[in-house]
Amino acid sequence: MPELPEVETVRRGLNRLVSGATIASIEVFWPKIINNDVDSFKQRLANQTIQTIDRRGKYLLFRFSNGLTMVSHLRMEGKYNVVPRGEDQGKHTHVIFHLTDDRDLLYNDTRKFGRMTLVPTGEENTVAGLRTIGPEPVAEQLTLAYMTATFGKSKKMIKPLLLDQSKIAGIGNIYADETLWMSKIHPMRPANSLTTDEIATLRQNIIDEMAMAIKGHGTTVHSFSTAFGEAGQFQNHLHVYGREGEPCERCGTIIEKIKVAQRGTHFCPLEQRL
């Protein structure tokens, strides 16, 4: 699943490609992707201009000229790309936004898990997932006081807590493993067992790692690609995720992979101890 850095990379690319573009018409080939009535969805966006594209956590927010916002969740495999009108759309394209400048904005999703929801701008929090979403992993929102209070009252293991979008927005499996390794914290540690210093270190590593991953245009492990159809580059800078059986960069101990809350989890057994 694309995590915050990947979704932010897509957002930036789409803003360069389609901000200011006007939708002529829409074709929907897999209606379940649309959470609204499909005919109404198509009618309400026809002849509307994409003013900008914002992001909240892992959700893209397409802002339209008529005061509507399309909340797009890519889920596991969703991706957007822009092609000239008439170009082969591919067998996994499920929604096409025909633009008035003879281009098509394609939504492609091999798993068909992605969802689009049209709401009045300002009412994005009525969409499931956004209703309870936590702060963004940036210094201004993810404060030490917030993290200390949140972790202090939870006996939950630290990794699944980091994956809980109601606690912190945008962290997924890759960046949870990476930031816990950077912080030398075992993924199964109870959140309330972390010291203030450990929380402060983890917080800073989350903020720094997400910023660096965005700068690296996200991580391509399976199929992620940018709005320009290019792979991300940050997979070349991962320290622990996907490196089971390889030596830890810091101490040389072999990286192990275990299941934590049903998620494959990579860690250094020497430096990340329970």
UniProtKB/Swiss-Prot annotation:
Its EC number is 3.2.2.23, 4.2.99.18. InterPro entries: DNA_glyclase/AP_lyase_DNA-bd, Formamido-pyr_DNA_Glyclase, FPG_cat, MutM-like_N-ter, Ribosomal_uS13-like_H2TH, Znf_DNA_glyclase/AP_lyase, Znf_FPG/IleRS. GO terms for biological process: base-excision repair. GO terms for molecular function: 8-oxo-7,8-dihydroguanine DNA N-glycosylase activity; class I DNA-(apurinic or apyrimidinic site) endonuclease activity; damaged DNA binding; zinc ion binding. Keywords: DNA damage, DNA repair, DNA-binding, Glycosidase, Hydrolase, Lyase, Metal-binding, Multifunctional enzyme, Zinc, Zinc-finger. Binds 1 zinc ion per subunit. It catalyses: Hydrolysis of DNA containing ring-opened 7-methylguanine residues, releasing 2,6-diamino-4-hydroxy-5-(N-methyl)formamidopyrimidine; 2'-deoxyribonucleotide-(2'-deoxyribose 5'-phosphate)-2'-deoxyribonucleotide-DNA = a 3'-end 2'-deoxyribonucleotide-(2,3-dehydro-2,3-deoxyribose 5'-phosphate)-DNA + a 5'-end 5'-phospho-2'-deoxyribonucleoside-DNA + H(+). The active site is at P2, E3, K58, R263. The keyword RNA-binding does not apply. Its cofactor is Zn(2+). DNA binds at H92, R111. A zinc finger (FPG-type) spans 239-273. The keyword Translocase does not apply. SMART domains: Fapy_DNA_glyco, H2TH. Signal peptide: none annotated. SUPFAM superfamilies: Glucocorticoid receptor-like (DNA-binding domain) (SSF57716), N-terminal domain of MutM-like DNA repair proteins (SSF81624), S13-like H2TH domain (SSF46946). Belongs to the FPG family. Involved in base excision repair of DNA damaged by oxidation or by mutagenic agents. Acts as a DNA glycosylase that recognizes and removes damaged bases. Has a preference for oxidized purines, such as 7,8-dihydro-8-oxoguanine (8-oxoG). Has AP (apurinic/apyrimidinic) lyase activity and introduces nicks in the DNA strand. Cleaves the DNA backbone by beta-delta elimination to generate a single-strand break at the site of the removed base with both 3'- and 5'-phosphates. Monomer. This is Formamidopyrimidine-DNA glycosylase. It comes from Lactiplantibacillus plantarum (strain ATCC BAA-793 / NCIMB 8826 / WCFS1) (Lactobacillus plantarum). The gene is mutM.
